């Protein structure tokens, strides 16, 4: 009897093959590159004797409209979680250069950059159907495994809230549902004695606690997150990802992320990540 069905989808080069191997290590029966038109026929047969199944569905699988239709059918019939793997363009380009593989949409008259852009446009509908988006740009295989384990175990546990601090100067994360920009508060980087510290340190916390508007904005973030969690749970979703951004990802964003972690940690499973803390 099928209890766990995972659909891995996303951009070419974003790590679906690596993720599929990790799911296989976790006990999933894995199928890659299955034509989308036969999935509806095969699933009822497979689901009789398999508890955990992972499918890769991507641009090789068939027409985008057919893929959307199949995913919608699976969501109506099975306990499916759709995981969309994403990555920044420059990362995808480097990965294709490193592996020397061709992008599935690459043609003689098309550059790799244009092929990636075309695939992004094609996958907008699938991205909207996805339950979880994972940005693999900065993840090694071990970190990707940790993300997958957290995502899949959250199905059996209470709601999962992921809080990510980051610096805008290093790029906007692709796998968050909300982004709160805290750059309008004074930057501790320019305060004597605080430059080398982070938002985890007492001195930085005291500085920001005493900054006008910080507490009020923190309360506003909590109200938005509370509202989103309630609506996500009503729709059967199990994870909300919140990004907190400042300039360098060292002080203000870390402080706000730490405060949110303390506030929510007792009521739901909270994962705290500081992407750019050195």
UniProtKB/Swiss-Prot annotation:
Residues engaged in binding ATP: 10-17
Gene Ontology molecular-function annotations: ATP binding; GTP binding
Pfam families reported in the protein's UniProt record: PapZ_C, RapZ-like_N
HAMAP family: RapZ_like
Physiological role: Displays ATPase and GTPase activities.
Family the entry assigns: Belongs to the RapZ-like family.
Protein name per UniProt: Nucleotide-binding protein Tmel_1373
């Amino acid at each position: 009897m099928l209890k766990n069905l995972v659909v891995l989808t996303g951009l070419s080069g974003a790590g679906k093959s690596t993720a599929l191997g990790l799911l296989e290590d976790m006990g999933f029966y894995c199928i890659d590159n299955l034509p989308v038109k036969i999935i509806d026929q095969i699933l009822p047969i497979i689901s009789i004797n398999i508890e955990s199944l992972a499918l890769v569905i991507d641009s090789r699988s068939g027409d985008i409209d057919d893929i959307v239709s199949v995913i919608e059918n699976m969501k109506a019939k099975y306990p499916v979680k759709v995981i969309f793997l994403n990555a920044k363009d420059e990362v995808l380009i480097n990965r294709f250069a490193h592996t020397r593989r061709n992008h599935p949409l690459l043609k003689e008259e098309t550059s790799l950059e244009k092929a990636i852009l075309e695939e992004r446009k094609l996958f907008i509908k699938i991205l909207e159907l996805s339950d979880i988006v994972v940005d693999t740009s900065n993840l090694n295989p071990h970190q990707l495994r940790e993300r997958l384990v957290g995502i899949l175990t959250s199905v059996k546990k209470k709601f999962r809230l992921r809080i990510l601090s980051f610096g805008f100067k290093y790029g906007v994360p692709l796998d968050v549902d909300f982004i709160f920009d805290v750059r309008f508060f004074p930057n501790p980087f320019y305060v004597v004695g605080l430059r080398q510290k982070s938002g985890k340190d007492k001195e930085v916390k005291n500085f920001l606690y005493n900054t006008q508007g910080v507490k009020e904005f923190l309360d506003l973030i909590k109200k938005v997150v509370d509202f989103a969690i309630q609506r996500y749970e009503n729709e059967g979703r199990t994870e909300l990802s919140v990004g907190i951004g400042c300039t360098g990802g060292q002080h203000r964003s870390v402080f706000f992320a730490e405060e949110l972690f303390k506030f929510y940690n007792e009521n739901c499973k909270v994962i705290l990540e500081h992407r750019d803390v050195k």
